[in-house]
């Protein structure tokens, strides 16, 4: 996946930036691309030092880059992975922000998940999980026939799965195993999601967190995995979101999230993008906002979609940014491919313009 999708990073690149395309599972070696997404000429000399800007900080990726022969004669300068970065990369951080928003802005406390740490043995873990599931089930909010389970470090819909109720022994056994392996799991109400959004921020070297853009995206119902982003002007996105909540409430939420992020990252050297996922859910006859589903301390698909709109969507047009399994879509009046891949490709990325 990373090998095929790496040329998409040209949406973020400019000037003399280089893009690292990792080796493919089929054995195609790693290579470097220029800011336009084209292969660098063979034998091209690299600078003595390169500052590395990662999609997201990850020990595995850092190790891969350090060991890559492409950089044998180049010193790579990596951003530090600090305790505060690791803390905010854990899904527990979204609980902490949600608790803050519940306290400061009055969002319902029934939205708060239950974080269950693995016990000293399987029996202790099972008791904790049973009690937490019963506690979530007793809340007036959510689907009474299931709860939602999340693993601590997964994102973009991965590691998220519904647990059917009443609880069956085989499902409980699998959940105990998952909690034991990952160290903890989150259990929360299963809500009827109507509309998915994200607030995208940037953090500067001075530590200031600023609003960057809105992201309006679709997910697959099964597992709630990412499906695509709505591409339209920032003004239109703002108008769409403030048709679902008041502008005052949105500005208050943005200010509160910025305040919390600046405080939590005060000892961090992280600079770059931060995405906070939201969604609107149905509660009886009402549509309500979940103000913090997930924190993504990295570049997000929403940021990529923002630049795809700026660079590829004609003035006055709207569309959808798609990332899918399978070969690329053929160009047409309504399809703009973003990857020039073969018919054997495993993934495709394209813009589908409104007709």
Where are the regions a protein language model picked out?
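A long amphipathic alpha-helix within ATP-dependent nucleotide-binding catalytic cores
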Residues: 182, 211-214, 223-288, 324-327, ...
């Amino acid at each position: 996946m990373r090998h095929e999708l790496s040329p998409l990073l040209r949406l973020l690149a400019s000037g003399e930036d280089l893009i690292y395309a990792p080796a493919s599972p089929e054995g195609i070696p790693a290579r470097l691309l220029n800011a336009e997404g084209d292969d660098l000429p063979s034998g091209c000399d690299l600078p003595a030092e390169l500052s590395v800007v990662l999609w997201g900080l990850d020990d595995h990726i850092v190790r891969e880059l350090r060991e890559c022969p492409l950089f044998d004669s180049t010193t790579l300068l990596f951003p530090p992975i600090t305790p505060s970065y690791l803390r905010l990369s854990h899904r527990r951080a979204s609980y902490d922000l949600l608790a803050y928003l519940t306290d400061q802005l009055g969002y319902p406390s029934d939205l708060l998940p239950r974080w269950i740490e693995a016990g000293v043995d399987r029996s202790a873990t099972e008791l904790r999980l049973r009690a937490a599931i019963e506690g979530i089930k007793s809340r007036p909010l959510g689907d009474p026939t299931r709860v939602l389970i999340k693993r601590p470090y997964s994102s973009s819909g991965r590691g998220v799965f519904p647990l059917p109720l009443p609880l069956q022994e085989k499902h409980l056994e699998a959940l105990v195993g998952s909690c034991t392996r990952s160290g903890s799991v989150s259990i929360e109400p299963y809500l009827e999601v109507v509309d998915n959004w994200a607030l995208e921020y940037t953090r500067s070297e001075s530590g200031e967190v600023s609003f960057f853009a809105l992201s309006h995206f679709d997910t697959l119902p099964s597992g709630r995995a990412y499906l695509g982003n709505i591409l339209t002007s920032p003004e239109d996105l703002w108008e769409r979101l403030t048709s679902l909540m008041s502008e005052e409430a949105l500005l208050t939420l943005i200010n509160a999230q910025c305040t919390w992020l600046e405080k939590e990252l005060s000892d961090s050297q992280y600079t770059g993008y931060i995405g906070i996922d939201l969604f609107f859910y149905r509660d009886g006859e009402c549509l309500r906002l979940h103000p913090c589903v997930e924190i993504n301390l990295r570049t997000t698909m929403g940021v990529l979609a923002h630049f795809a709109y700026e660079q590829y969507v004609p003035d006055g047009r709207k569309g959808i940014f798609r990332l899918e399994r399978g070969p690329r879509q053929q160009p047409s009046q309504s399809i703009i491919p973003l990857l020039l891949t073969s018919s054997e490709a495993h993934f495709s990325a394209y813009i589908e313009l409104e007709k």
